Regions:
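Aromatic- and glycine-rich beta-strand/loop motifs that create alpha-glucan
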Residues: 1-24, 261-275
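Terminal transmembrane helical anchor/hairpin motif
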Residues: 34-45, 61-71, 194-275
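Secretory targeting signals
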Residues: 20-51, 55-101, 121-191
């Protein structure tokens, strides 16, 4: 069995991962993006009597939501904004927990000469990222079906949720995972989640539209497609920077594990050296 698969299964069985996924689904539900709480309609349009709330857009904004976003894109953008904000905090917890448990039960895996530090850390990083992306993929698939039922399959972009999950949310997961992983690898202490929680606390006062944000871009509106199109370049640069920074932090974590393997890294813990 490959190291990636072993790490992936270990992550999926961990209590911290199960708790993070549960919290993610609950946040998505209470943030009204899983499932969506409103259907997009044009100003002056007849309201369907099916009990679903409506989001009335001005004629120009509705035309963009219909022709550019094809409805599902507008919902997917709000989904990515709110779920991405939650994952910026939650993804750090399983990463920190895994290295925290290594202090007791998996020290042999860290010190084993048969597996390089770089392979171990990057396989673990990939497994953590894939595991946190899994519930997002399931929700994206479910919401694509919901959009097709609400607007008709011919009227929606069937790939919209997948594109936003891949290009908007995945870099957030990658960066937050690295933030959880690096302090735990350096010190053996779960400091990464504290940093993520601090960011989450400060993000409460962030502007509703922040496309260049490194951790989690924001687009807190169902619609506003023109604003999004004007800032898509800033969004792309921020997403690339987040992914590259996540990889850089992961490389630093691998260096820290290698340092410990050679008997020098324990000086990082309160000045003590390995015996």
């Amino acid at each position: 069995m490959s190291l990636f698969r072993l790490e992936f299964l270990r992550v999926c069985r961990s209590a911290s991962y199960i708790a993070a996924v549960t919290a993610l689904v609950l946040i998505a539900y209470f943030q009204n993006v899983f499932p969506p709480s409103a259907r997009i309609v044009a100003a002056g349009a007849e309201i369907a009597a099916d009990g679903l709330e409506t989001c009335v857009l001005a004629a120009g904004d509705y035309a963009l939501a219909r022709d550019v976003d094809r409805f599902s894109g507008a919902h997917a953008r709000l989904f990515a904004s709110r779920v991405g904000g939650a994952l910026a905090v939650l993804s750090a917890f399983p990463a920190a927990a895994l290295f925290w448990h290594d202090r007791r039960g998996c020290r042999a895996a860290v010190c084993a000469r048969s597996v390089s530090s770089w392979k171990l850390v990057f396989c673990r990083y990939a497994a953590l990222t894939a595991a946190m992306a899994l519930p997002v993929a399931v929700m994206a698939l479910t919401l694509t079906c919901v959009a097709a039922m609400d607007y008709g399959p011919a009227n929606v972009d069937m790939l919209a949720y997948g594109k936003y999950a891949l290009f908007w949310i995945l870099p957030t997961i990658a960066l937050s995972t690295a933030v959880g992983l690096l302090p735990a690898a350096l010190t053996g202490l779960p400091l990464g989640p504290l940093l993520a929680l601090l960011w989450g606390w400060r993000a409460r006062s962030a502007p509703a539209f922040a496309y260049a944000a490194l951790f989690a871009p924001r687009h807190e509106a169902l619609g506003e497609t023109a604003r999004f199109l004007e800032n898509v370049g800033a969004l792309a640069r921020g997403r690339v920077a987040a992914a590259l920074l996540g990889l850089a932090l992961c490389a630093l974590a691998a260096f820290a594990v290698e340092w410990k393997r050679r008997g020098r890294g324990y000086a990082l813990r309160f000045g003590r050296r390995a015996a």
